[in-house]
Curated annotation (Swiss-Prot):
It comes from Oryza sativa subsp. japonica. This is Probable histidine kinase 2. The modification Phosphohistidine is found at residue 401. GO terms for molecular function: histidine phosphotransfer kinase activity; phosphorelay sensor kinase activity. Residues 1-16, 358-1048 are cytoplasmic. It is an enzyme of class 2 (transferase). It is a multi-pass membrane protein.
Length: 1048
């Protein structure tokens, strides 16, 4: 305890240190920040000054570099003038023209080039409109008449007719001076001949001997603006220019006035900047010399000025560059001040915070002492809870093993009793087996909870039929529904599920979803009904399944909330990418489980999917069902939720969807010439349910108990074209029969399908060519009668009297009589049905394969000219019923007949088997089961006994055989959990014995555990196969054949 106090004191000192440490850090950071800011400010000021001067220098150099067209124009003028003087052909325009055009065409910025003679004649080339305009010629005769004419753009020769032009009053000043006074050339500003109103710079040179003058005109704005175009991307830069001439005089030209400057960058001259031009003095330089840059600091806090002037033979061009200092400089300075202020405020805040934290630390010390004592108590409680949890896990594992063993015994007794039971007992045994499997599922659900929470659940991929799974789940729920007086039924809706191919997925987990939802509905419903509705829809439409996806709006809702609010993140993260959504072989199934129970309050709907949560106490259960259901649904790419029912409706509606993949075994339709192909019973059933209006003209008299069953049957009968007559009571059966018979003649026979039309339009080619369908779908009778009577609620004598009229009607009209029963119907009643000439007995609930049996019974009437079935005889009711089921509903018979279907009755005949089992009941059951399969069984009560028996058997075999040692046993069934020596140790020792003789006997592990660790342990010790109890005969045969085939 003293050590703890010392540690606590040391920790408090450390806390005080860490409280003061931030204050010291902040002060140090402030000092470093201020020094760094001042240094950086000075450096940036110097750098920005150099950058400013460099930017303005670059701008002026760029402008000066673009003055080259003026030099080229001046040079070309003197060159032409010298050429004309040397050749002495000054008066010949045909000789002057080509030289002028050559210079004109080589300089695109020349607006005009001309030659003027002393006698008043003139000749010029100009560009109409300026820039890249059309080249034309203009000339004047000595009498003062001016003409203009188009020229050839390649040679400059005039083409076409000359047109008169407005006479020009005067020549440019420098040209006039050269003609009158002579001289060495010069420049002047004037309007051009071809572009009136455009100020041009005329560069002139005299022709020797006083014969005339050559001049070239360049538009000042074209040259200057073109040079300034490259500076437009520079921000905070103003560029101005002005031009001043001397009017042709010889005196030096004056500098441009400040008001004469114009902006080159198109932003206009600010009044404040223009006012400063008068205080800026610049030095003029020749145009072909480097510009002299004068930088001025007038109003240096806002602007930096630079200027230069160019003297062009008496014409001065002035340029002013204004660099507006960026606003970022001021922002930087203000930011520095703000930063210093913030740093000071942070230091003050840190000081205050340190004081407050010191006071809070004192109070925390007292709480820490109290919490330390509580922590010690909680730590002890945690250790105790962990020990209890470990003991609970061990106890649960042991209890799970015992429960599985007991259930295995019950399942084995059911399996052994099945061959000796009569038909009524077989149905009860089937229900006992379903209930045993239900108990196993409850046990597995508790184990699955742990797997789901740890993320270790792996979905299996097996092929199964969705309709069969739905039917099995509803049948099992119906057992409870009968005892409670609740109507349980599967509503196929649009029959899209019945039209599907086989599905690949985890049928066990999917059935667990249905069983949990149906079980909850049965638990909380005391009256009314429980309905399972089902639809199927292909995400990529390619088949006949066209039911709309009834869960699309939920996906949009989830995406909306997850995007804007982060809600439902689990759903989005789990199903953000599902490859089956874009798989053409995938099918989306949507299900609804609707009941009329007590319902779920809205405030508890969000929590019902949590583990160990129940809506109401006192209804039993573990509270794990809906949590596991939601996990499995999401693993299958779907979502589950509680749907709103209509106002005033009782109960709850659970809706969920899953994405599964079809088996892809459905072959394409074959051509008729290719002959018949093998057609499965599933293909026949799916094709039959795709037919519509195939019994048009038939009448159905329907007397059924249960509103939902009545609704489903009526909707289905009407969908296949029958006219349905609802019977309100038993006493009304005869009268309704008479009404139906008298009204049948009103049907238009021509509108009914013939057999050939139905076969060719409805069934695919493979079914049309199949011998079975050809036999069942022969020539039809257009009309028929169907009587469906529900005898599940008794009143059999009244029904028998009412049905006599129907029996007499058979000789007149094709008729069928169908009775609906339930699990409470006795064997004596079955005998009475035979006396009533009942054609088909269907057990409620009526769905799936039973609807298929009913449909094929009607087909039987269509395939014969008599009312008697071609496939079923009336002499023996039992034979008739079983044969019909075998022909038209192979899946139904296979599901009700749980016995093994093999080529022989004794598939293990002659095999020598060693059974190692410590439970006496399981010994008896498994031994009898193996004997029934034809095996010779030896028993061992524990692992040590099994090792001794194996050692003795192999020694006897080795003595009798000289060359090779045969296997002492064909297969060994080894229980894993046994006293004295368990199955793992026994297997290890058996493998050691076998290694001496070079043999290996197949060993199949039998265990009541279903964890993956047990499977891996069995493989590690040398077992060949792992089977979880209870063990069925079918699984035994498959396991033995599997290991024996692998050995061979």
């Amino acid at each position: 305890m003293r050590e703890v106090e010392e540690v606590s004191k040391w920790r408090r000192r450390c806390c005080y240190f860490w409280i003061l440490f931030p204050l010291a850090v902040i002060a140090t950071c402030m000092t470093i920040t201020v020094v760094t800011f001042c240094s950086s400010t000075m450096y940036m000021t110097e750098v920005m000054g150099e950058a400013t001067k460099g930017a303005m220098d670059s701008a002026l150099m760029h402008i000066a570099g673009n003055m080259r067209p003026l030099l080229e124009a001046n040079r070309s003028v003197f060159t032409i003038a010298n050429t004309l003087h040397v050749q002495g052909n000054m008066a010949s325009f045909s000789h002057v023209g080509p030289k002028l055009f050559l210079a004109f065409s080589m300089q695109p910025l020349q607006a005009q080039i001309s030659y003027a003679a002393v006698d008043g004649a003139a000749f010029a080339y100009y560009r109409a409109g300026g820039g890249d305009g059309e080249a034309r010629a203009m000339f004047a005769r000595p009498n003062g008449t001016w003409f203009t004419q188009a020229v050839d753009p390649a040679t400059g020769r005039p083409v076409g007719n000359a047109t008169a032009a407005a006479p020009h009053q005067q020549l440019p000043p420098n040209v006039t001076r050269l003609l009158l006074d002579g001289g060495g050339g010069g420049a002047s500003l004037a309007d051009g001949w071809a572009r009136p109103g455009v100020r041009m710079l005329f560069l002139s040179a005299p022709v020797g001997g006083g014969g005339g003058a050559v001049s070239a005109a360049v538009a000042v704005d074209d040259v200057v603006l073109r040079g300034a175009a490259g500076l437009r991307q520079l921000r905070d830069l103003g560029m101005y220019y002005a031009v001043a001439g001397n009017g042709g005089a010889t005196a030096a030209p004056p500098a441009p006035e400040p008001a004469a400057y114009r902006s080159l960058l198109g932003d206009g001259a600010a009044a404040e900047e223009m006012a400063l031009f008068s205080s800026v003095k610049c030095t003029a330089s020749a145009i072909d010399a480097p510009p002299k840059l004068d930088v001025h600091g007038v109003k240096s806090d806002k602007y930096r000025f630079a200027c230069t002037n160019f003297d062009i033979s008496g014409v001065q061009m002035g340029f002013r560059v204004v660099l507006r200092k960026s606003a970022m400089v001021g922002v930087f300075r203000r930011g520095g001040v703000t930063m210093v202020a913030v740093a000071c405020a942070a230091a003050a805040a840190a000081t205050v915070a340190c004081v407050l934290m010191a006071r809070a630390l004192r109070r925390a010390v007292a709480r820490e002492a109290a919490l330390g004592a509580d922590l010690a108590r909680h730590r002890d409680a945690l250790r105790q809870a962990e020990r209890k949890s470990m003991n609970k896990s061990n106890a649960f594992a042991s209890a799970s093993h015992d429960i599985r063993s007991a259930l295995a015994a019950v399942a084995g007794l059911v399996e052994v009793s099945r061959p000796e039971a009569n038909p009524n007992i077989v149905d009860n045994l089937n229900q006992m087996e379903l209930c045993t499997n239900k108990l196993l599922d409850i046990l597995n659900s508790i184990l699955d909870t742990t797997k789901v929470e740890s993320g270790k659940v792996q979905l299996e991929e097996v092929e199964f039929n969705m309709a069969d799974v739905l039917e099995e789940s509803v049948d099992m729920a119906n057992v409870v529904g009968i005892t409670k007086g609740i109507e349980v039924i599967w509503d196929p809706c649009d029959f899209s599920v019945m039209k599907c191919d086989n599905i690949i997925g985890d049928s066990k987990r999917f059935k667990q979803i249905l069983d949990n939802l149906l079980g909850n509905a049965m638990k909380f419903t005391q009256e009314g009904h429980v309905i399972l509705r089902a639809w199927a829809n292909r995400p990529i439409a390619r088949g006949s399944i066209g039911a709309p996806s009834r869960f699309a709006y939920r996906s949009l809702e989830n995406n909306f909330f997850s995007f804007f609010f982060g809600a439902k993140e689990d759903r989005v993260s789990q199903n953000s990418f599902n490859p089956l959504q874009n798989d053409p072989n995938s099918v989306e199934f949507y299900f609804e489980v609707v009941d009329t129970g007590i319902g779920i309050p809205k405030e508890k709907r969000e929590s019902v999917f949590e583990n160990y949560v129940q809506v109401k106490e006192g209804h039993g259960g573990t509270g794990l069902g809906l949590g596991i259901v939601q996990s499995f649904v999401r693993l299958m790419g779907g979502e589950i939720s509680i749907k709103e029912k209509e106002p005033g409706e009782r109960g709850t509606c659970f809706g969920f969807n899953v994405l599964l993949k079809t088996s892809g075994n459905q072959a394409a339709e074959e051509d008729i010439e290719e002959g018949p192909s093998t057609v499965s019973e599933l293909d026949i059933r799916a094709s039959v349910f795709r037919e519509t209006n195939c019994f048009k003209g038939w009448h159905c008299i329907l007397f059924v108990h249960g509103d939902e069953t009545r609704r489903v049957l009526q909707a289905w009968m009407e969908s296949i074209g029958m006219k349905v007559w609802m019977v309100p009571g038993v006493e009304s059966i005869s009268s309704t029969l008479e009404k139906a018979r008298s009204s049948r003649d009103d049907c238009d026979v021509d509108r009914c399908f013939s057999s050939k039309e139905m076969v060719s339009q409805v069934l695919p080619t493979t079914l049309r060519n199949n011998n079975i369908m050809a036999r069942n779908l022969g020539e039809h009778h257009p009309l028929g009668m169907l009587l469906i009577v529900d005898v599940s609620n008794g009143q059999l004598e009244n029904i028998q009297r009412q049905a006599r009229d129907f029996t007499q009607m058979r000789s007149q009209v094709p008729c069928k009589f169908v009775c609906l029963t339930d699990l409470r119907t006795s064997y004596k009643d079955f005998r009475r049905f035979e006396e009533m000439s009942c054609d088909l007995i269907l057990r409620k609930p009526v769905h799936g394969s039973r609807l298929y049996s009913l449909l094929m019974t009607l087909r039987d009437v269509q395939s014969s000219p008599m009312h008697r079935s071609s496939l079923v005889g009336h002499e023996n009711y039992v034979t008739r019923h079983q044969d019909s089921a075998n022909i038209v509903a192979l899946a139904e018979v296979g599901r009700l007949d749980q016995g093994l279907k093999t080529e022989e009755d004794r598939p293990l005949d002659g095999m020598h088997v060693l059974l190692v089992e410590d439970t006496l009941v399981l010994q008896t059951i498994q031994r009898k089961m193996l004997n029934q399969l034809g095996a010779i069984v030896e028993l061992a009560g524990d692992g040590a006994k099994a090792v001794d028996m194996f050692r003795d058997a192999i020694e006897r075999a080795s003595v009798s055989e000289e060359h090779s040692v045969p296997l002492p046993y064909d297969v060994i069934f080894m229980d894993c959990q046994m006293p004295r020596m368990d199955g793992y140790e026994a297997t290890r020792r058996i493998r050691e014995e076998e290694s001496r003789y070079g043999i290996r006997t197949p060993i199949i592990a039998l265990t009541a555990h279903s964890m993956e660790d047990d499977l891996q342990k069995a493989i590690d010790v040398g077992m060949d196969l792992h089977m979880t109890k209870p063990i069925e005969r079918r699984r035994i045969v498959e396991a033995v054949h599997g290991v024996c085939k692998g050995k061979n």
